[in-house]
Amino acid sequence: MFKFHAIKLRINIRPPNSKSQGFWLHFGLAIATFVGIICLAVLPAITQQPVTVKVLIQALEGTQWEPLVEDFNNEHPNLRLEVVKGPNNTNLVEDLYTSAFLLGDSPYDLVYMDIVWVQKFAAAGWLSSLSDRVTETQLDAYLEGDVNGGRYEGKLYRMPFRTDGGMLYYRTDLLKEIGAEPPETFEELMTLSNTLQEQELVPWGYVWQGKQYEGLSAMFTEILEGYGGFWIDADTQEVGLDKPEAIAAVEFLRDTISEGISPPGVTTYAEEETRRLFQNGNSAFLRNWPYVYSLASDSEIAGKFAIKPMVHQPEHGSGACLGGWGFGISASSDNQDEAWTVIEYFSRPEVQIKYFLETGYVPAKTSLFNDPQLVAKFSYLPDLLNVVQNPVLRPPVAQYAQASDILQRYLSAALTGSQTPEQAMQAAANETRALLKR
């Protein structure tokens, strides 16, 4: 059993005289004021941690971001941008974002996304609208296609950062040798390819992405545009895959194989396989993305090629399938204002110039295509602007991923000969219509 003993404390206080009382009173007040100021100034700095803004990104680009992330964090001591490096496969990054959102509380404040993810993510309620944070005048500085690709039901959900667009690469030296101009139409492309092959100047005429993957859908979007067709009308939900223009587009691609213009293996080629064929001097024409330019400029065909918009039918125009990446804000984030601060930083011209000089990516701001620093290093940028200013978007529908899978499967069947173009496109159209009605 515990025992407690009382302790007596006796304090003798003598009454101070009036002079000492005044001195100690003022001294005490001064000390209290000083301590209060120190607490107000120092304690928040000690106890307040920077707000962390998280974003998931492909590992390669995450590494390329490191200088910008360091600069941002130094410039914003109360914020900390944290980059989570994911796989380099963009489909897997999309899956990781999707899984995080489906769990109900995504750890990511920023969403760095491909243009084709916008509709799916916005329709699911996973993104916050950016419309109240940016004016239309500010958006006018960007490529129109990139801005429109970031909208869903009239609201903006994605701020453009860098763009991409499909184009035609061609060998200037080979065309000069036969005294020809670059092709403008599908027929001219076939004729020039055949001439160059007959004169044994090049093994193959034209290479393109025929493998069953997203690149096949992107490539076909451009051919379809060149024939005056369409995939899905996002406003009316009408499907155009079984119309004559779409069937003619498939027949053109089949003809490049059957007539020996393209190699039989083209139906297994993605971007890199086609780039290597062109870069090694084995093809006169190539459909690909801007990244090829820098690589080909450091190869045996350096100075012997140029770019132009894709070929098309005489009565129709060219269209570049628009790709590219931009920023959204997670609807579940508690740090939405801070996430917008990051977007504002990445939108500054000087930040973008620094990044694009280092990486060779293509800016989404139109003025940067003629920026002296960028043009001095990437002389093709003004020509590239002519390409990306005539974009064709993949269908901006929430079910895009499933629609693309349908198209890829049936295109592959038609290109490999297991179905006729009519059979394949009719089946693709029927499945797509059923998908849109779900």
Question: What are the roles of these predicted feature ranges?
Answer:
Residues L192-T195, Q199, D235-T267, M310:
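Glycine-centered hinge/linker elements that transmit conformational signals in sensory
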Residues S99, S106-D109, T137-L174, W204, ...:
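A structural signal for short loop-to-beta-strand junctions that line the ligand-binding cleft
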Residues N74-E75, R80-K85, T98, L156, ...:
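Extracytoplasmic/periplasmic substrate-recognition and gating elements
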Residues Q48, G303, K308, L357-R409, ...:
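Long, aromatic- and glycine/proline-rich binding clefts that accommodate carbohydrate-like moieties
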